[in-house]
Regions:
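ASCE P-loop NTPase motor core, strongest for the SF2 helicase catalytic module
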Residues: 47-224
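Long, charged, low-complexity intrinsically disordered regions
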Residues: 1-75
Length: 224
């Protein structure tokens, strides 16, 4: 690929520019982009039998033993505090039983981390449950709706604690046109410049961050 569409830090999506590979100094960013261009096998893996799903769930919990969550393969895992681990297990059990949950701890006790741990667990460790519940043959992403002032915090924490691909469906300087740009280049696998190459069946991102107002405005685009 000769050029990359660059989203500059702290600038709007409308300020994106096409740049040649050789002038981009951060080669790790290029490598990360290239990795995101390939559909992971786990997103397309066939649904398993009930016995296989139970075994997968047990194996999953072993990986999460002691509340360790890793941002990437081979990276040093971060550890949840005991009460955060207990909160995560409660969220997980409610999710498995199809129950809604509300965390109402005081500020600063790690509610966000507990929810993020559940996201990592659901997407990478408990994939089958998500797909069976949604009757989907491919993995579906997670939608996080939060106040605008907290979106940056959510993104930093998700990137710090997990290996999930998270994008922010919001732009301070752009309206619907900019959101269509995000959808065109960030949502699906394939080349946004070549419509026929885009696979609309599998989402590239794992987590979409946005606000309540944008959710209402773009409800048709965000509906599963």
């Amino acid at each position: 690929m000769g050029r990359y569409l660059v989203k500059w830090v702290d600038l709007s999506y409308k300020d994106c520019t096409w740049e040649k590979k050789e002038v981009i100094a951060d080669k790790e960013m290029i490598a990360a982009y290239e990795r995101r261009q390939h559909i992971p096998e786990w997103k397309l893996a066939p649904l398993k039998s009930k016995a296989e799903r139970v075994a997968l769930g047990e194996k999953s919990m072993l990986k999460f033993k002691e509340g360790k969550v890793s941002a990437s393969e081979g990276a040093e895992a971060k550890t949840l505090r005991p009460y955060q681990w207990e909160g995560f297990r409660w969220l997980k059990n409610n999710y498995n039983e199809g129950k809604n949950s509300i965390l109402a701890d005081e500020m600063g006790l790690g509610k966000t981390i507990q929810v993020i741990s559940l996201m990592e667990h659901v997407v990478h460790k408990w994939t089958w449950a998500w797909r069976v519940r949604c009757s989907m043959q491919t993995q579906q992403p997670i939608l996080v709706i939060a106040p605008l002032s907290t979106l940056g915090f959510w993104r930093r924490e998700i990137e710090s604690w997990t290996s999930l691909n998270v994008i922010m469906y919001h732009d301070n300087e752009g309206g619907k046109e900019v959101r269509r740009l995000i959808e065109k280049y960030e949502w699906y696998y394939g080349n946004g410049q070549v419509p026929e190459s885009v696979d609309h069946e599998v989402f590239k991102f794992d987590v979409l961050l946005t606000t309540y107002e944008i959710t209402i405005a773009d409800v048709d685009a965000l509906m599963p």
